[in-house]
Amino acid sequence: MKKLIFLFAFSIAVTNIFAQTDPNQIKKEGNDAFNAKNYPVAYAKFSEYLKQTNNQDSATAYYCGIAADEVKKYAEAVTFFDIAIQKKFNTGNAYARKALALDALKKTDEYVATLEEGLKVDPNNKTMIKNYGLHYLKAGLAAQKAGKAEEAEECFKKVIPLDHKSYKTNALYSLGVLCYNDGANILKKATP
């Protein structure tokens, strides 16, 4: 009798350990956690769901990326936003959020490349326009302060085509200052 009870208890334990939770239930739990802004739980549930479904749900991948970003798992966020981009779900915002995650990882070249790629797909995405313009304005000002006029000029010229009035104005103003300073330096060298 003891062996029978032990065998019964053992089989129940093994069944519970190896039983797969229903993916739809996991997704629902992830959605509930996400809506409650409980991002660690949402990330765990969404990533488990995506693992079970072989990353087939682009919307869940996008929201898992947001949850990963919120819990500062930026590398994982990039991976999930890539899935959303590949499956063409909310592409513009997926590019914008991927870029922000790359920026948090201090991968500046990939950050800029992602913004450029994203702007080709969604040229009116305000977040990408803002981040791209701000990046090149800061880079141009840093180059200008370092005495690298040509590099600064290139940075400012990348901002001008953007549809952001204040960034465009700042870039044009900075280009004007750059030209003025260049002229002043030439004049200074010409007069003894």
Q: Predicted regions span which residues?
A:
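Register position in tetratricopeptide repeats
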Residues: 35-36, 70-71, 83, 104-105, ...
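Short coil turns that delineate tetratricopeptide repeat
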Residues: 54-55, 89, 123, 164-166
